[in-house]
């Protein structure tokens, strides 16, 4: 919640130190950047230790802030490096860390007092329940999902006392951030590890549309929406672009600084957007034009650009008979692009009229086609001159006292900070006594510093005829500037007190021994009645010795069937259980919650709450932080006696994450899809009652909640078409002539290699699931997983027909030919 409505934060990106300087000079209040480890832009320039310390100092000199991105998922072995990585930045005064991993969050919270933690957009915070959970955990700020409307953001602001940060400009992902495995599963480069290869920006085909960029949204520009965004309660306006140039960072930062200040000073009546400013932003970077993101629409087709995935620039004219009829002025050094993709660099500028092209420049371009400028050379030069070639300066006042026979004294002051330094005793001058002009000349030599002052800012007091060497004045000036810098910076600096903890990684605990699983259970997820009926029939057949799989639990998904459909399916299992005399053969039924739990879905579950309670589900499979807080708030957690399993997409990459979830009341976990066999084994053996001894990170705590004496339930998906994307965008809607809303079902994409990716449009929740082209298959690794300590393996049925379900149940998938091992063998980068 915003306490001071006259202040808002412009938060700019920096992939390099030059970008950082550009952001500060252009008016950013804060800069977010990545260090040498654990950032979500592993291919940005990023900052080494020296540069990052320098950035923190520079920002604090100017009264700005630095936020460090640690917004990736960390494995157990990487946690050991985390505290020592953060420590020097914390001690220098780092303002906040942006975090995705729940384990990382807990470690930073418990080891770095006073360090603000910001919940990354990778945590998929889509409403007030998730924001409330993160505040309870200790977050000072949440970065909302890009898909939220201004109204939904306002609902968070009005109900949770926490700062809100939202993206306002730059690239949009087609998938909810934190829910994407497309790059991970296709090429082994995980977005959750900062290495996304952006296969979403490649061509796909569906619904008769061939080879278009069906998963590529336009860039977002919300300059015109600033009044509504600020009124919704957004405190920090975040600009995307840690892979962008310094000119881009400076130009976009300046524009948002200008219009945020305009609205705060003049209100709606005085808020007027200059079309020229929007044009300059288009010149800097746009993908097929701009959109306003999701602030005003849930999944408007205008968000998408099917024709190109990269910078389009602006239209500057049209082709006619080998010439360009200019609609915009062009400059020397501008780069023009024609319809066939060819480029031409302008040798000399021209304001209007016809621009003749050398013979052969235009090859296949037809008359009447548009010519785009993809580089505005003059604009880039202007930005560089204003914001990159020179740094902003802090005003400084100086007062120097030069008295014959006494020590020289220099006092400097900048805002409310001051420093006083002394020199040697001044002797009487025989030939060249000090003059005011001479003194001012030396004191004004502030080049290479953060300060500036005019003659009027320097007070010179001379008593007698002292001899004042130039060296003395220079030494006084340097010492005073060093002291006032330290005075300014000292407020943010801290000292980390290291607790006296036993060091080590894993040490054998003879009391509990290695985690073991006596029986490997089998669970199944279904999406419709046909799949469920096939399972029931197969399980019945198993009683007669035909089935290879004994089902202990069924998860009922609601993406296609809705809540009522899941309740109806629950009654089918109840009927089956009534005819089972052996309690050990009875099947538990868990309700699988949606992947995304936005306010419209919250209202739906509120409406169906009594029906859900009456249905008598045995537990819940939850898939978002929103749902975890929701079930705590409405009594469902107590209703099910804490029988809650979190799904793979809530990411338990490490022991510390398991510990943190356990503190929040969760002891059932679906293991990550991005850990290989060795990493899974290490994680399984580090958690719960059967953890191998006490696990700590060097001298630091993994979290205050780990007692090594818990029963932890671990489940691993062993078969299924894995969702690679969860999207607010509806590609079926974007590519259909009619409106497909309300017609939930399965449709298919084809990628450039001819592989088909199934997708489900879940109209009840208004999101899409896009699945891998082949299923993951690990059912033959069941014994291996059991020996790791996994309690159950799960079969995830999604798009399978009834006969396919029966085949997999009866043969343990032995007949499956085309499949993937996921990351079980190779892991991710």
Task: Enumerate the language-model features and the residues they cover.
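Long, basic N-terminal domains or extensions that often function
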Residues: 140
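Active-site pocket-lining/capping segments in soluble small-molecule metabolic enzymes
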Residues: 2-125, 143-236, 243-829
């Amino acid at each position: 919640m915003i306490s001071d409505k006259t202040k808002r934060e412009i938060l700019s990106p920096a992939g390099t130190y030059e970008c950082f300087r550009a952001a500060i000079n252009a008016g950013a209040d804060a800069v977010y950047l990545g260090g040498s480890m654990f950032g979500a832009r592993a291919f940005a320039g990023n900052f080494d230790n020296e540069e990052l310390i320098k950035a923190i100092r520079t920002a604090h000199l100017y009264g700005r802030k630095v936020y460090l991105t640690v917004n990736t998922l960390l494995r157990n072995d990487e946690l050991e490096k985390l505290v020592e990585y953060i420590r020097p930045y914390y001690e220098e005064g780092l303002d906040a860390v942006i975090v995705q991993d729940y384990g990382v969050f807990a470690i930073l919270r418990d080891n770095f007092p006073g360090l603000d933690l910001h919940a990354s957009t990778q945590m998929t915070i889509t409403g007030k329940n998730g924001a409330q959970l993160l505040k309870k955990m200790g977050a000072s700020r949440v970065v909302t999902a890009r898909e939220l409307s201004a109204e939904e953001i306002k609902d968070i602001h009005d109900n949770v006392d926490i700062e809100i940060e939202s993206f306002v400009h730059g690239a949009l992902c087609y998938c909810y951030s934190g829910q994407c495995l497309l790059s991970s599963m296709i090429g082994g480069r995980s977005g959750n590890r900062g290495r996304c290869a952006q296969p979403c920006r490649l061509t796909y085909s569906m619904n008769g549309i061939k080879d278009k960029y069906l998963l590529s949204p336009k860039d977002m520009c919300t300059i015109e929406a600033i009044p509504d965004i600020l009124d919704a309660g957004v405190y920090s306006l975040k600009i995307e672009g840690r892979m962008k140039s310094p000119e881009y960072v400076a130009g976009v930062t300046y524009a948002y600084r200008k219009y945020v200040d305009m609205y705060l000073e003049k209100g709606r009546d005085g808020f007027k957007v200059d079309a020229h400013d929007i044009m300059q932003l288009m010149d800097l970077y746009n993908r097929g034009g701009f959109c306003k993101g999701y602030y005003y629409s849930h999944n408007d087709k205008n968000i998408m650009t099917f024709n190109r995935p990269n910078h389009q620039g602006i239209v500057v004219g049209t082709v006619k008979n080998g010439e360009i009829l200019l609609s915009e002025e062009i400059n020397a050094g501008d780069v023009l692009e024609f319809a066939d993709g060819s480029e031409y660099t302008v040798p000399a500028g021209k304001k209007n009229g016809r621009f003749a092209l050398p013979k052969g420049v235009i090859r296949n371009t037809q008359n009447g086609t548009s010519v785009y400028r993809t580089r505005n050379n003059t604009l880039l030069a202007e930005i560089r001159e204003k914001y990159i070639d020179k740094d902003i300066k802090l005003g400084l006042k100086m007062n120097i006292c030069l008295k014959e026979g006494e020590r020289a004294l220099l006092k400097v002051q900048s805002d409310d900070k001051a420093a006083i330094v002394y020199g040697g005793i001044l002797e009487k001058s025989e030939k060249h006594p000090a003059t005011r002009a001479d003194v001012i000349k030396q004191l004004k030599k502030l080049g290479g510093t953060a300060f500036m002052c005019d003659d009027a800012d320097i007070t010179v007091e001379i008593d007698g005829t002292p001899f004042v060497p130039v060296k003395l004045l220079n030494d006084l000036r340097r010492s005073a500037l060093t002291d006032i810098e330290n005075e300014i910076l000292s407020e943010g600096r801290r000292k980390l007190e290291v607790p006296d903890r036993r060091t080590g990684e894993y040490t054998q605990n003879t009391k509990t021994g290695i985690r073991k699983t006596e029986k490997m259970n089998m669970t199944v997820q279904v999406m419709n009645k046909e799949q469920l009926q096939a399972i029931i029939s197969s399980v019945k057949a198993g009683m007669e010795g035909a089935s290879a799989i004994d089902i202990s639990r069924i998860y009922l998904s609601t993406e296609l069937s809705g809540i009522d459909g899941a309740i109806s399916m629950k009654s089918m299992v109840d009927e089956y259980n009534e005819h089972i005399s052996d309690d050990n053969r009875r099947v538990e039924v868990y309700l699988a919650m949606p992947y995304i739990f936005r306010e419209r879905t919250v209202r739906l579950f509120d409406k169906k709450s009594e029906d859900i309670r009456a249905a008598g589900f045995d537990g819940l499979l939850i898939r978002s932080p929103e749902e975890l807080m929701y079930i705590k708030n409405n009594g469902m957690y107590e209703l099910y006696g804490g029988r809650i399993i979190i799904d793979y997409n809530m990411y338990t990459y490490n022991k510390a994450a398991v510990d943190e979830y356990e503190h929040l009341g969760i002891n059932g976990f679906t293991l990550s899809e991005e850990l290989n066999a060795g990493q899974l084994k290490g994680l399984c053996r580090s958690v719960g009652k059967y953890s191998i001894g006490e696990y700590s990170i060097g001298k630091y705590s993994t979290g205050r909640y780990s007692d090594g004496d818990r029963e932890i339930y671990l489940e691993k998906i062993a078969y299924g078409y894995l969702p690679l994307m969860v999207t607010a965008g509806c590609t079926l809607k974007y590519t259909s002539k009619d409106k497909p809303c309300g017609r939930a079902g399965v449709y298919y994409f084809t990628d450039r290699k001819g592989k088909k990716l199934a997708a489900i449009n879940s109209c009840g929740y208004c999101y899409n699931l896009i699945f891998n082209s082949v299923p993951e298959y690990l059912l033959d690794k069941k014994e291996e997983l059991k020996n790791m300590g996994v309690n159950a393996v799960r079969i995830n049925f999604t798009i399978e027909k009834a006969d396919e379900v029966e085949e997999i149940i009866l043969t343990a998938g032995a007949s499956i030919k085309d499949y993937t091992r996921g990351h079980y063998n190779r892991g991710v980068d």
